[in-house]
From Swiss-Prot:
It comes from Vibrio cholerae serotype O1 (strain ATCC 39541 / Classical Ogawa 395 / O395). Signal peptide: none annotated. The gene is fabA. GO terms for molecular function: (3R)-hydroxyacyl-[acyl-carrier-protein] dehydratase activity; trans-2-decenoyl-acyl-carrier-protein isomerase activity. Necessary for the introduction of cis unsaturation into fatty acids. Catalyzes the dehydration of (3R)-3-hydroxydecanoyl-ACP to E-(2)-decenoyl-ACP and then its isomerization to Z-(3)-decenoyl-ACP. Can catalyze the dehydratase reaction for beta-hydroxyacyl-ACPs with saturated chain lengths up to 16:0, being most active on intermediate chain length. InterPro entries: FabA, FabA_FabZ, HotDog_dom_sf. Its EC number is 4.2.1.59, 5.3.3.14. This is 3-hydroxydecanoyl-[acyl-carrier-protein] dehydratase. It is found in: Cytoplasm. PANTHER family: 3-HYDROXYACYL-[ACYL-CARRIER-PROTEIN] DEHYDRATASE, 3-HYDROXYDECANOYL-[ACYL-CARRIER-PROTEIN] DEHYDRATASE. Its main location: cytoplasm. One of its GO terms (cellular component) is cytoplasm. The active site is at H71.
Length: 172
């Protein structure tokens, strides 16, 4: 694997979406508009709540982001499912970062709680992912807990985010 670092900028994340960051066969992030972060500010295999890995990432909020026009006209708010998807994206990125190969797929989440919202007046969303378990055998899978903060205030909590990497997704 190439380009294993402890942080990544927007250009790096765009390279990942094209399969050019870690190399052939490693999981890719989605391309814009579904790429839900602008930078990853910290990657660690040993830190975090469970000592199994920590990911911190950020999304800059501007009123012209695509989802504010359609969700909802006259009452713009970032869809909660996009924050959830961002957490799955980051778990998949972590799996590639630790050497896992395959195509990333979200497998589920145990529990999600929304206690706030992301409005066009916000400045920054922060994602915090605490890895609980990584399986890197024939099956590559990550299990994590995550939090979404807007301008420093926690607004979503997800428990047991699951992502798998698959060599063949035709039967998925």
């Amino acid at each position: 694997m190439q380009n294993k670092r402890d942080s990544y900028n927007r250009e790096d994340l765009l390279a990942s979406s094209q399969g050019e960051l870690f190399g052939e066969g490693y999981p890719q992030l989605p391309a814009p508009n579904m790429l839900m972060m602008d930078r990853i500010t910290k990657m660690s295999e040993t830190e975090g709540e469970f000592g199994k890995g920590l990911i911190l990432a950020e999304l800059d909020i501007t009123p012209d982001l695509w989802f504010f026009d359609c969700h909802f006209p006259g009452d713009p708010v970032m869809p909660g499912c996009l924050g959830l998807d961002a957490m799955w994206q980051l778990v998949g990125f972590f799996l590639g970062w630790v050497g896992g190969k395959g195509k990333g797929r979200a497998l589920g989440v145990g529990e999600v709680k929304f206690t706030g919202q992301i409005l066009p007046t916000a400045k920054k969303v922060t994602y915090e992912i605490n890895m609980k378990r990584v399986v890197n055998r024939k099956l590559v899978m990550g299990l994590a807990d995550g939090r979404v903060l807007v301008d420093g205030k926690e607004i979503y909590v997800a428990k047991d985010l699951k992502v798998g990497l698959f060599q063949d997704t035709s039967a998925f």
